[in-house]
Amino acid sequence: MSENIIEKRAAARHRVLKGGRLAFHDGGGVDCIVRNISPTGARIDVANPVGLPESFTLLIEADHFRQSCHPVWSHDTHVGVAFD
């Protein structure tokens, strides 16, 4: 079954488990957990992905990481984001 999966990511992601925050351009935001990350995107978990804006900034304070991004898919509490 796995041989039929087509990988669409531009870069391999690395498994992590880090606390983060999605900072919205209107000043709001939500906490998240970063599950994997690459130079081009990440998979994050949020309490409720409904209502996420079209773009936001992913912050990982422990790594001094800040990157504009946008969601490309979501399933339950999982969200895939692409970096801008």
Predicted feature descriptions by range:
Residues V50-L52, S74:
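Short, surface-exposed beta-strand-loop junctions and turns on beta-sheet-rich folds
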Residues D31-V34, Q67-V72:
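Short beta-strand-centered aromatic/proline hotspots
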